[in-house]
A protein has these predicted regions:
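Generic alpha-helical transmembrane segments of integral inner-membrane proteins
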Residues: 18-22, 42-53, 90-101, 115, ...
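Multi-pass membrane catalytic core of lipid/isoprenoid biosynthesis enzymes
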Residues: 64, 69-114, 161, 165-176, ...
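Short, aromatic-rich membrane-interface segments at the entry and exit
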Residues: 36-37, 108-114, 132-134, 163-167, ...
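Topogenic membrane-insertion module of multi-pass membrane proteins
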Residues: 1-68, 81-91
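Signature of alpha-helical transmembrane segments in polytopic membrane proteins
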Residues: 21-31, 37-55, 95-104, 155, ...
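Acidic (Asp/Glu-rich) catalytic motifs at the cytosolic membrane interface
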Residues: 51-79, 134, 178-188, 254-255
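Long, highly hydrophobic alpha-helical transmembrane signal-anchor segments
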Residues: 16, 20-38, 128-165
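C-terminal membrane-associated helical module and adjoining short loops/tails
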Residues: 2-6, 13, 126, 144, ...
Length: 297
Protein backbone atom coordinates (compact mmCIF):
# COMPACT_ATOMS: atom_id res chain seq x y z
CA UNK A 1 0.00 0.00 0.00
CA UNK A 2 3.03 2.30 -0.21
CA UNK A 3 2.08 3.71 -3.60
CA UNK A 4 -1.51 4.77 -2.71
CA UNK A 5 -0.30 6.31 0.56
CA UNK A 6 2.45 8.21 -1.24
CA UNK A 7 -0.03 9.45 -3.83
CA UNK A 8 -2.33 10.62 -1.03
CA UNK A 9 0.51 12.81 0.25
CA UNK A 10 0.30 14.65 -3.11
CA UNK A 11 4.05 15.01 -3.74
CA UNK A 12 3.38 17.33 -6.69
CA UNK A 13 2.11 19.94 -4.24
CA UNK A 14 5.23 19.77 -2.06
CA UNK A 15 6.64 22.53 -4.23
CA UNK A 16 4.67 24.93 -2.00
CA UNK A 17 7.06 24.09 0.83
CA UNK A 18 9.96 25.56 -1.14
CA UNK A 19 8.90 28.87 0.39
CA UNK A 20 10.91 27.80 3.45
CA UNK A 21 13.99 28.71 1.42
CA UNK A 22 12.87 32.29 0.70
CA UNK A 23 14.47 33.89 3.82
CA UNK A 24 17.84 32.37 2.90
CA UNK A 25 17.55 33.49 -0.73
CA UNK A 26 17.26 37.10 0.43
CA UNK A 27 20.06 36.95 2.99
CA UNK A 28 23.74 37.83 2.95
CA UNK A 29 26.30 36.02 0.80
CA UNK A 30 27.91 34.31 3.80
CA UNK A 31 24.58 32.66 4.61
CA UNK A 32 23.67 31.77 1.01
CA UNK A 33 27.05 30.15 0.38
CA UNK A 34 26.87 27.91 3.46
CA UNK A 35 25.87 24.35 2.57
CA UNK A 36 25.04 23.74 6.23
CA UNK A 37 22.25 26.31 6.03
CA UNK A 38 20.78 24.66 2.95
CA UNK A 39 20.89 21.24 4.61
CA UNK A 40 18.98 22.45 7.67
CA UNK A 41 16.40 24.09 5.44
CA UNK A 42 16.16 20.86 3.47
CA UNK A 43 15.32 19.09 6.75
CA UNK A 44 12.66 21.72 7.45
CA UNK A 45 11.33 21.27 3.92
CA UNK A 46 11.02 17.50 4.47
CA UNK A 47 9.14 18.07 7.73
CA UNK A 48 6.66 20.42 6.08
CA UNK A 49 6.20 17.93 3.25
CA UNK A 50 5.18 15.42 5.90
CA UNK A 51 2.84 17.89 7.61
CA UNK A 52 1.22 19.03 4.37
CA UNK A 53 0.90 15.40 3.28
CA UNK A 54 -0.88 14.58 6.54
CA UNK A 55 -3.23 17.51 5.91
CA UNK A 56 -4.03 16.24 2.41
CA UNK A 57 -4.88 12.80 3.79
CA UNK A 58 -7.09 14.38 6.45
CA UNK A 59 -8.84 16.50 3.85
CA UNK A 60 -9.44 13.47 1.61
CA UNK A 61 -10.97 11.56 4.53
CA UNK A 62 -13.30 14.43 5.40
CA UNK A 63 -14.29 15.06 1.76
CA UNK A 64 -14.61 11.38 0.86
CA UNK A 65 -18.29 11.50 -0.08
CA UNK A 66 -18.01 14.57 -2.33
CA UNK A 67 -14.70 13.44 -3.87
CA UNK A 68 -16.25 10.16 -5.01
CA UNK A 69 -18.67 11.99 -7.33
CA UNK A 70 -16.20 14.68 -8.45
CA UNK A 71 -14.96 14.28 -12.07
CA UNK A 72 -11.30 14.75 -11.09
CA UNK A 73 -11.01 14.10 -7.35
CA UNK A 74 -12.67 10.70 -7.70
CA UNK A 75 -9.30 9.39 -8.88
CA UNK A 76 -7.60 10.10 -5.56
CA UNK A 77 -6.53 6.91 -3.70
CA UNK A 78 -9.03 7.19 -0.83
CA UNK A 79 -11.97 8.27 -3.02
CA UNK A 80 -11.24 5.53 -5.57
CA UNK A 81 -10.95 2.84 -2.91
CA UNK A 82 -7.26 2.09 -3.46
CA UNK A 83 -6.60 3.22 0.10
CA UNK A 84 -9.05 2.41 2.88
CA UNK A 85 -10.06 5.04 5.42
CA UNK A 86 -8.57 2.91 8.21
CA UNK A 87 -5.20 2.73 6.46
CA UNK A 88 -5.35 6.43 5.66
CA UNK A 89 -5.99 7.34 9.30
CA UNK A 90 -3.07 5.17 10.44
CA UNK A 91 -0.76 6.79 7.90
CA UNK A 92 -2.00 10.25 8.90
CA UNK A 93 -1.26 9.73 12.61
CA UNK A 94 2.16 8.18 11.97
CA UNK A 95 3.30 10.89 9.55
CA UNK A 96 1.98 13.66 11.81
CA UNK A 97 3.73 12.20 14.88
CA UNK A 98 7.09 11.82 13.10
CA UNK A 99 6.87 15.30 11.56
CA UNK A 100 6.09 17.06 14.85
CA UNK A 101 8.80 15.16 16.76
CA UNK A 102 11.31 16.13 14.07
CA UNK A 103 10.12 19.76 14.19
CA UNK A 104 10.58 19.84 17.97
CA UNK A 105 14.22 18.84 17.52
CA UNK A 106 14.97 21.77 15.20
CA UNK A 107 13.96 24.81 17.26
CA UNK A 108 11.12 26.11 19.41
CA UNK A 109 10.21 28.68 16.75
CA UNK A 110 10.15 26.08 13.98
CA UNK A 111 8.03 23.70 16.07
CA UNK A 112 5.57 26.48 16.93
CA UNK A 113 5.19 27.43 13.27
CA UNK A 114 4.87 23.79 12.20
CA UNK A 115 2.22 23.14 14.85
CA UNK A 116 0.46 26.39 13.95
CA UNK A 117 0.48 25.35 10.29
CA UNK A 118 -1.17 22.02 11.11
CA UNK A 119 -3.75 23.59 13.45
CA UNK A 120 -4.63 26.17 10.79
CA UNK A 121 -5.14 23.43 8.21
CA UNK A 122 -7.08 21.29 10.66
CA UNK A 123 -9.46 24.22 11.22
CA UNK A 124 -9.55 24.75 7.45
CA UNK A 125 -10.49 21.13 6.75
CA UNK A 126 -13.15 21.01 9.46
CA UNK A 127 -14.79 24.42 9.10
CA UNK A 128 -12.94 27.33 7.49
CA UNK A 129 -12.96 25.95 3.94
CA UNK A 130 -16.76 26.21 4.06
CA UNK A 131 -16.61 29.99 4.57
CA UNK A 132 -16.19 32.05 1.40
CA UNK A 133 -13.19 34.42 1.33
CA UNK A 134 -11.90 33.03 4.65
CA UNK A 135 -10.93 29.87 2.75
CA UNK A 136 -8.55 31.70 0.41
CA UNK A 137 -7.13 33.84 3.23
CA UNK A 138 -6.19 30.64 5.08
CA UNK A 139 -4.26 29.61 1.99
CA UNK A 140 -2.28 32.86 2.16
CA UNK A 141 -1.54 32.46 5.87
CA UNK A 142 -0.27 28.94 5.19
CA UNK A 143 2.34 30.28 2.77
CA UNK A 144 3.43 32.93 5.27
CA UNK A 145 3.88 30.28 7.97
CA UNK A 146 6.02 28.24 5.58
CA UNK A 147 8.21 31.26 4.87
CA UNK A 148 8.66 32.13 8.54
CA UNK A 149 9.46 28.47 9.24
CA UNK A 150 12.52 28.94 7.05
CA UNK A 151 13.80 31.42 9.62
CA UNK A 152 12.95 29.04 12.46
CA UNK A 153 14.78 26.15 10.80
CA UNK A 154 18.10 28.01 10.95
CA UNK A 155 17.80 28.90 14.63
CA UNK A 156 19.21 25.45 15.39
CA UNK A 157 22.64 26.84 14.42
CA UNK A 158 21.94 30.27 15.93
CA UNK A 159 21.51 32.09 12.62
CA UNK A 160 19.13 35.02 12.85
CA UNK A 161 17.61 35.91 9.49
CA UNK A 162 15.22 38.78 8.92
CA UNK A 163 12.61 39.15 6.24
CA UNK A 164 10.88 42.27 4.98
CA UNK A 165 7.23 42.83 5.81
CA UNK A 166 6.68 43.84 2.18
CA UNK A 167 7.98 40.47 0.99
CA UNK A 168 5.77 38.65 3.49
CA UNK A 169 2.73 40.60 2.25
CA UNK A 170 3.68 39.86 -1.37
CA UNK A 171 3.92 36.14 -0.59
CA UNK A 172 0.55 36.29 1.16
CA UNK A 173 -1.12 37.90 -1.85
CA UNK A 174 0.56 35.48 -4.27
CA UNK A 175 -0.86 32.56 -2.29
CA UNK A 176 -4.33 34.14 -2.28
CA UNK A 177 -3.92 34.66 -6.04
CA UNK A 178 -3.25 30.93 -6.49
CA UNK A 179 -6.20 30.03 -4.25
CA UNK A 180 -8.57 32.20 -6.28
CA UNK A 181 -7.34 30.53 -9.47
CA UNK A 182 -8.01 27.14 -7.91
CA UNK A 183 -11.54 28.18 -6.97
CA UNK A 184 -12.15 29.45 -10.49
CA UNK A 185 -10.93 26.26 -12.14
CA UNK A 186 -12.92 24.03 -9.79
CA UNK A 187 -16.11 25.95 -10.56
CA UNK A 188 -15.50 25.55 -14.30
CA UNK A 189 -14.85 21.83 -13.89
CA UNK A 190 -18.22 21.38 -12.16
CA UNK A 191 -20.19 24.15 -13.89
CA UNK A 192 -22.77 21.71 -15.26
CA UNK A 193 -22.83 19.69 -12.05
CA UNK A 194 -23.78 22.15 -9.32
CA UNK A 195 -24.37 19.30 -6.89
CA UNK A 196 -20.62 18.62 -6.89
CA UNK A 197 -19.64 22.08 -5.72
CA UNK A 198 -18.68 22.84 -2.17
CA UNK A 199 -21.14 25.11 -0.36
CA UNK A 200 -18.80 28.11 -0.28
CA UNK A 201 -18.35 27.94 -4.04
CA UNK A 202 -21.96 29.01 -4.48
CA UNK A 203 -20.92 32.45 -3.22
CA UNK A 204 -18.29 32.74 -5.94
CA UNK A 205 -18.95 33.58 -9.57
CA UNK A 206 -16.49 33.51 -12.45
CA UNK A 207 -16.81 37.30 -12.89
CA UNK A 208 -16.11 37.90 -9.21
CA UNK A 209 -13.10 35.58 -9.24
CA UNK A 210 -11.73 37.16 -12.43
CA UNK A 211 -11.96 40.64 -10.89
CA UNK A 212 -10.48 39.69 -7.52
CA UNK A 213 -7.73 37.63 -9.14
CA UNK A 214 -6.67 40.66 -11.18
CA UNK A 215 -6.67 42.89 -8.09
CA UNK A 216 -4.66 40.41 -6.02
CA UNK A 217 -2.24 39.89 -8.91
CA UNK A 218 -1.57 43.64 -8.98
CA UNK A 219 -1.05 43.75 -5.21
CA UNK A 220 1.41 40.85 -5.41
CA UNK A 221 3.55 42.69 -7.95
CA UNK A 222 3.19 46.01 -6.11
CA UNK A 223 4.41 44.72 -2.75
CA UNK A 224 7.24 42.74 -4.35
CA UNK A 225 8.37 45.93 -6.08
CA UNK A 226 8.13 47.83 -2.78
CA UNK A 227 10.27 45.14 -1.16
CA UNK A 228 12.93 45.29 -3.86
CA UNK A 229 13.03 49.10 -4.00
CA UNK A 230 13.41 49.33 -0.22
CA UNK A 231 15.75 46.38 0.21
CA UNK A 232 18.52 48.55 1.67
CA UNK A 233 16.15 49.78 4.38
CA UNK A 234 14.65 46.43 5.33
CA UNK A 235 17.66 44.14 5.64
CA UNK A 236 21.25 44.07 6.76
CA UNK A 237 22.56 44.24 3.20
CA UNK A 238 21.85 46.37 0.17
CA UNK A 239 21.49 45.13 -3.38
CA UNK A 240 19.63 47.38 -5.75
CA UNK A 241 20.22 44.88 -8.58
CA UNK A 242 17.27 42.88 -7.27
CA UNK A 243 15.09 45.37 -9.13
CA UNK A 244 15.88 43.35 -12.27
CA UNK A 245 13.87 40.42 -10.90
CA UNK A 246 10.63 42.41 -11.02
CA UNK A 247 9.97 41.60 -14.73
CA UNK A 248 10.23 37.88 -13.92
CA UNK A 249 7.56 38.18 -11.23
CA UNK A 250 5.34 40.16 -13.61
CA UNK A 251 5.80 37.47 -16.26
CA UNK A 252 4.90 34.67 -13.83
CA UNK A 253 1.70 36.43 -12.74
CA UNK A 254 0.64 37.32 -16.29
CA UNK A 255 1.50 33.83 -17.50
CA UNK A 256 -0.81 32.33 -14.87
CA UNK A 257 -3.63 34.65 -15.98
CA UNK A 258 -3.01 33.82 -19.63
CA UNK A 259 -3.11 30.09 -18.94
CA UNK A 260 -6.36 30.05 -16.96
CA UNK A 261 -8.17 32.18 -19.51
CA UNK A 262 -7.06 29.92 -22.36
CA UNK A 263 -7.38 26.59 -20.59
CA UNK A 264 -9.99 24.66 -22.52
CA UNK A 265 -9.70 21.60 -20.26
CA UNK A 266 -10.23 23.68 -17.09
CA UNK A 267 -7.45 21.93 -15.21
CA UNK A 268 -6.69 22.68 -11.57
CA UNK A 269 -3.99 25.30 -10.96
CA UNK A 270 -1.59 22.73 -9.48
CA UNK A 271 -1.75 20.69 -12.69
CA UNK A 272 -1.28 23.78 -14.83
CA UNK A 273 1.86 24.74 -12.93
CA UNK A 274 3.64 21.49 -13.75
CA UNK A 275 2.49 21.31 -17.35
CA UNK A 276 3.47 24.80 -18.46
CA UNK A 277 7.16 24.85 -19.36
CA UNK A 278 7.48 28.67 -19.61
CA UNK A 279 6.03 28.97 -16.10
CA UNK A 280 8.46 26.39 -14.72
CA UNK A 281 11.38 28.01 -16.53
CA UNK A 282 10.50 31.48 -15.25
CA UNK A 283 10.30 30.19 -11.67
CA UNK A 284 13.72 28.57 -11.96
CA UNK A 285 15.12 31.72 -13.58
CA UNK A 286 13.83 33.83 -10.67
CA UNK A 287 15.53 31.60 -8.08
CA UNK A 288 18.81 31.53 -10.02
CA UNK A 289 18.70 35.31 -10.46
CA UNK A 290 18.16 35.92 -6.73
CA UNK A 291 21.02 33.60 -5.76
CA UNK A 292 23.36 35.03 -8.39
CA UNK A 293 22.63 38.66 -7.49
CA UNK A 294 22.91 38.18 -3.73
CA UNK A 295 25.96 35.92 -3.98
CA UNK A 296 27.75 38.58 -6.00
CA UNK A 297 27.83 40.96 -3.02
Amino acid sequence: MISPIFRSLRPKLWVKNLFLFVPLLFSEKKFICSWENWLYLLAGFAIFCGLSGAVYILNDIIDLASDRIHPVKCNRPIASGLLSVKEAKAALLLILFISLIAAWNISAMFFSLALGYFILNLAYCLKLKKIAIIDVLCFGIGYVLRTLAGIGALKIINIELQISNSLIISIFFFAVFLALIKRRQDILITENKAVLRRKEYTFYSIDYLDQTTSIIAGLTIFFYAIFVLNIEKTSSFANTNLIYTIPIIIYIILRYLLIIHNDEENELSSDLTFKDKPLIASGILWVISIIAINSAL
